[in-house]
Each structure stands twice: as structure tokens, then as C-alpha cells.
């Protein structure tokens, strides 16, 4: 396998693949997917790189990209790399204050923005960002503020050097590009404290490509990947770079909420996702089964049982299934499994990397039982994504797979997972104290995650900082309980409360549609959502479902009381990070009255 520096990667692939499709994006006016060939991708990156020189961008300068997923994000990335510049992605959902912090911390002069929301947020803090000189707007539909005298649209930016007059400078910079150059600074939104900029160098990505080539030999240039998670997230960013390195076609999903439509239009072979995606699939299947009766219901249940035995008890362990079991499995593969996959849009599936949170055992078993190759993994921004992931055979349900080649893992004090290797960050941008606290003198990066190794498989137990201590001195892992309860089809979001409290309670955001359906079925009258959620029958429904799911936990770990919320946790109120992780301190503050009420005698 040949490894190219990111500054030339797209051009080398264009030489190899020419008119083959490299990227696709959805035109929302025509509802058509527009293809971009490798040749066009390369030409656009070259034009972007030249326009950057015309704009005045210098080597190792920090460039901001504040946008939802768009092809322009990749043009900007690779145009910057050709100039030895550094790209800093901001989450499309970032608030003006979050954008202001990153712009000032990284001293960004040029910020590329996506749509109206990002433009408005960036322009509103322009005066508070001394380094900021100009916004470059991807979407022509954005309406500029009447006071804005400096911003330009991306097509105007590209027109700054249509003749490639600065190509000699670009070529000179590219020739000087090194693996030791900084590639990205990825700001972790952080559930506590201010964001930290994780520095990822070109050598981090080169090593990530190498170890994934060893681990994922079945990924080919015939694959089609759906780009679903934000390109700001290291999981999707590193994955998309890997796809480009492997010649995989990347289909860019602009709006996360449209994934159920776009996945059916593209029918990809690959897609990075988070456990919540599969939890919704599982909940949908359970709902369908609960509505069926007689033979159809029996067949659906049998199909899952047969799949579990065939794929998990036999194939997973490298054993050959008995002939009758195999024939039964093949029947269901052509009927029930095929229908399920087609309904989701993944009947062409090769494999589906899944990470970002714990995958409940029930979900993992179900997905593999119906013949979907979900590759569960574990990684961090600081490790250029993957630390460990499933193998096709020999994976262990409940684990996060086996450690990637040449990544060193050690279990330290408090069972903390420590990492060392060429994919690990050199530290946090302009934060020497935070870097020294995270990377010890022997080069071990301290993840803050607790876990253990067993037979070469890595298991996560909890986030060390998230451990709660009850007023009775018992330690509770809220994430373990939340992961278990969140698989219930009636539960959308959950926050476990226990710190310095005498027992465990929970704030629960229900799936409102399912609750309304249940009320209709049971003849429950109500005038508003608050009244419905307080109804004794609804309270009893949730009590029973919670008690069933939490049986495996010790008595002191179980939810004793809960409150059903009438609206979801939100990023706007600061309750969720940009990666939708709970900010527990904010939740505790925002819902203090409701929480205190649960502990009244």
C-alpha cells in the first residue's frame, strides 16, 4: 500500500482513478445526488489552494471551517494541506460564544462558514475576535448582514485565482510539506471546563492509515461510504480521510436529520455511526414484533434466535454451523433479514464502524444476529480515532474489540486506560499544563476512561470523572445505567442523578410519540404533555420498564425515583455537548428544583 502525504493525496488518487466518482452530495432543489470525479476533486482542491495563496494564507497558519458537512469542507481541508496550513473545524451547532473562543484561541484570520446559522453566529462575534479578518461563505443562499463589508462567497474566493497564477508557490509549499507538520486542531467540546485543542499532525494520520489497512483489508475502492457524522468529529474526519486514501466513494450527508432518507437513496456499503442509530433500529424492530401476532410474530422471533446461534455462537467463534441451522439462516437471510436491511437502506452493507458511546450488549447481539457487520470500536480525538475495534471473527460482545496494531495499551491506577503510539496526539494547543496532566513523562496518554484487558480484548467500565459517590459512600457509574436504560423504546434521553445523594434517581426524556400511542391504546385522556406524563398509568409503565432493565444492577445502583420531562435536553441550554454528551453539571443546575423534589421525604 502506498502512503501519500495529505497535501498530495487527492491528486495522486486522481491520477489513479480519473473520472471515477470520488464524492457525491445532495442538491436539495432537485433532490438529485451530484457526482464529483476524482479528476474534478483534484482540480477543485488545486484551485482552492491557489485561491488561498491569493488570499494571503501562509504555511502553518490556522484556518477555521465552521460548517455542516459539505464538499467544500474537504476542498478547504486539502487546499490548506497543499499550503502546509492547519484546518480547525468548528461544530455546525456551535454557539457564537463557542466560535469566539476557538477563533481567539487559534488566532484564526480566515473562517470558512457553511449556511446562515454559522454565518450569523460568526458575524455576531466578529468584533470580539481581534485576529479575524474575513468570512468565506460556502452557501450562496446566505444573506449577508448590511454592515458586513468584508465577507465573500466561496465562488468569489475561488475566482481570486482562476488561472492558477500562484501554482508555483503552492507546489513549493507542498514540496516542503512534512509528516511533522500540524494538520488539524480539533477542539473537544468537553463535558467540563473550557474546550481543549487536540493537535493532530500528518504523521498521526499516516500511522492511522497504516494500521487500518492492516485491520480492515476488506475495505476496497468498490465501497461507497455515507458521511453521516459531523466532519468536525475525529471519528468521521479520520474515517473520511481513510476513505480517500483507499479510493472509496464518499457521499456527503448535509443534514443529520435527513439520514433516514439519504441512506435509502445511496444504499451505502460503509457508514460510521453512533450506538443511538442502531438503538433506534432495534427499537423499531421490537415495536414491529410487538404489533404482530401468530405465525408472522413467531417467524420474526425465530429469525433473530436462528441468526444469533448461527452468527454469534458459531461464525463468531470460527465454527461451522450445522447444515440445518445454516439452511434456516439462508432462508431468513433472503426474507426477514433482507427486508430489514432494505427498509433501513443497508442491504449492500460491507461493514459499519460504530463508536462514540457504549454499545449495549442487546443491540450488538441483535445487529450481528440479523447479519449486519457492525464493527464496534473505541477511540478518542487524542488517538486519531481508533484505539481498538472488532475483528470479523473472534469478537467479544461487551468489549470494544482488540487493540489496533502497534497501539500500546496499559491499565494504570484506578483501572485507567493508558495509550502510547504514533497515532497519539503530542498535546493540547497552547495548553502545556493540560498536556503535562494528560501525557506522563513516559509518554503514556491518560484517557480518563476505566477498563480492563482480557484475552487481548479491551473492555470499558466507566468514565473515571463521571463516577458518582452517593451520600452512603457507594460508587455509581451513571453511564453504565444510562446505556442500559436507553435501549428502551420509550426512553429517548436519560440523566442519572446520584452524586452526594442518598439514592439514585433519573431525569427521563420519553419518546413522546410512543407515549401518546400508549395513551390512545389505554384510553388515557389528557389536555397537555405534562398532564399525560404525570398520569399514574404512564408513571407505572415507565416504573415497570425501568425495573425490568435494571435487574442486573446492585440494589444501591438502581433508579429509585424518576421524573419524566416535557422537553428534551438541548445544546442551546448548554445541557449537551456538540457530540450530544450530557453536561452533568449543567443538567444538575438547570433541573435543580425537579431533582430536589425527587429527594423529598
Give residue spans per PLM region:
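Structural core segment of the AMP-binding/adenylate-forming
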Residues: 9-10, 82-160, 541, 547
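Conserved pre-ATP/AMP-binding loop-to-beta segment of ANL
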Residues: 18-21, 137, 162-187, 194, ...
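Conserved AMP-binding/adenylate-forming core of the ANL superfamily
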Residues: 23-71, 75-78, 95-100, 153-159, ...
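ANL superfamily adenylate-forming
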Residues: 27-30, 117-178, 285-339
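Conserved AMP-binding A3 loop
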Residues: 35-39, 183-209
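Conserved structural elements of the adenylate-forming
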Residues: 42-47, 179, 198-218, 338
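Conserved AMP-binding/adenylation subdomain of ANL enzymes
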Residues: 206-224, 231-337, 348
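Conserved ATP-binding/catalytic segment of the ANL
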Residues: 403-470, 498
Amino acid at each position: 500500500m502506498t502512503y501519500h502525504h495529505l497535501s498530495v493525496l487527492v491528486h495522486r488518487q486522481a491520477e489513479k482513478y480519473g473520472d471515477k466518482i470520488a464524492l457525491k452530495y445532495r442538491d436539495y432543489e432537485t433532490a438529485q445526488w451530484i457526482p464529483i470525479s476524482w479528476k474534478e476533486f483534484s482540480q477543485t482542491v488545486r484551485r482552492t489552494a491557489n485561491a488561498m495563496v491569493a488570499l494571503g494564507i501562509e504555511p502553518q497558519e490556522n484556518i477555521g471551517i465552521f460548517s455542516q458537512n459539505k464538499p467544500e469542507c474537504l476542498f478547504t481541508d486539502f487546499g490548506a494541506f497543499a499550503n502546509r496550513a492547519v484546518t480547525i473545524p468548528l461544530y455546525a451547532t456551535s454557539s457564537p460564544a463557542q466560535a469566539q473562543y476557538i477563533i481567539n484561541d487559534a488566532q484564526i484570520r480566515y473562517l470558512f462558514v457553511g449556511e446562515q446559522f454559522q454565518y450569523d453566529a460568526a458575524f455576531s462575534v466578529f468584533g470580539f475576535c481581534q485576529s479575524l479578518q474575513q468570512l468565506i461563505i460556502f452557501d450562496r443562499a446566505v444573506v449577508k448582514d448590511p454592515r458586513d463589508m468584508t465577507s465573500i462567497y466561496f465562488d468569489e474566493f475561488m475566482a481570486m485565482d482562476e488561472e492558477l497564477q500562484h501554482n508555483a508557490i503552492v507546489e513549493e509549499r507542498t514540496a516542503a510539506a512534512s509528516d511533522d507538520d500540524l494538520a488539524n486542531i480539533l477542539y473537544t467540546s468537553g463535558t467540563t471546563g473550557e474546550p481543549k485543542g487536540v493537535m493532530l499532525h500528518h504523521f498521526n494520520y499516516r500511522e492511522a492509515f497504516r494500521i487500518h489497512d492492516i485491520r480492515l483489508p476488506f475495505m476496497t475502492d468498490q465501497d461507497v461510504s455515507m458521511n453521516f457524522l459531523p466532519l468536525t468529529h475525529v471519528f468521521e474526519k479520520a474515517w473520511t480521510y481513510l476513505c480517500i486514501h483507499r479510493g472509496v466513494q464518499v457521499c456527503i450527508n448535509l443534514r443529520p436529520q435527513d439520514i433516514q432518507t439519504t441512506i435509502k437513496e445511496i444504499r451505502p456499503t460503509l457508514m460510521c455511526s453512533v450506538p443511538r442509530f442502531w438503538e433506534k433500529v432495534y427499537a423499531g424492530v421490537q415495536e414491529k414484533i410487538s404489533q404482530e401476532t401468530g405465525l408472522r410474530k413467531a417467524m420474526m422471533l425465530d429469525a433473530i434466535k436462528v441468526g444469533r446461534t448461527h452468527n454469534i455462537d458459531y461464525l463468531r467463534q470460527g465454527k461451522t454451523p450445522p447444515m440445518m441451522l445454516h439452511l434456516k439462516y439462508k432462508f431468513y437471510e433472503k426474507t426477514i433479514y433482507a427486508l430489514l436491511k432494505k427498509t433501513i437502506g443497508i442491504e449492500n452493507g460491507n461493514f459499519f464502524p460504530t463508536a462514540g458511546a457504549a454499545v449495549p450488549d442487546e443491540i450488538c447481539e441483535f445487529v450481528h444476529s440479523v447479519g449486519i457487520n457492525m464493527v464496534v470500536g473505541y477511540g478518542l480525538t487524542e488517538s486519531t480515532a481508533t484505539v481498538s475495534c472488532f475483528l470479523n471473527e473472534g469478537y467479544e460482545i461487551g468489549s470494544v474489540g482488540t487493540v489496533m496494531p502497534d497501539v500500546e495499551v496499559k491499565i494504570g491506577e484506578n483501572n485507567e486506560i493508558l495509550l502510547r503510539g504514533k497515532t497519539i496526539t503530542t498535546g493540547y494547543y497552547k495548553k502545556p499544563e493540560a498536556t503535562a496532566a494528560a501525557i506522563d513523562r513516559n509518554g503514556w496518554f491518560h484517557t480518563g476512561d476505566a477498563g480492563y484487558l482480557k484475552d487481548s480484548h479491551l473492555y470499558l467500565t466507566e468514565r473515571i470523572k463521571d463516577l458518582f459517590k452517593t451520600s452512603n459512600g457507594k460508587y455509581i457509574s451513571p453511564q453504565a445505567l444510562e446505556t442500559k436504560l436507553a435501549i428502551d423504546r420509550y426512553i429517548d434521553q436519560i440523566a442519572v442523578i446520584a452524586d452526594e445523594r442518598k439514592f439514585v434517581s433519573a431525569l427521563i426524556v420519553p419518546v413522546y410519540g410512543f407515549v401518546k400511542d400508549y395513551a390512545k391504546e389505554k384510553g388515557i385522556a389528557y389536555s397537555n404533555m405534562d398532564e399525560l406524563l404525570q398520569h399514574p398509568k404512564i408513571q407505572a409503565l415507565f416504573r415497570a420498564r425501568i425495573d425490568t432493565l435494571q435487574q442486573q444492577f446492585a440494589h444501591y445502583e438502581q433508579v429509585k425515583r424518576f421524573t419524566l420531562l416535557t422537553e428534551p435536553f438541548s445544546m442551546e441550554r448548554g445541557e449537551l455537548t456538540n457530540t450530544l454528551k450530557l453536561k452533568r453539571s449543567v443538567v444538575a443546575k438547570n433541573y435543580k428544583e425537579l431533582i430536589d423534589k425527587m429527594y423529598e421525604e
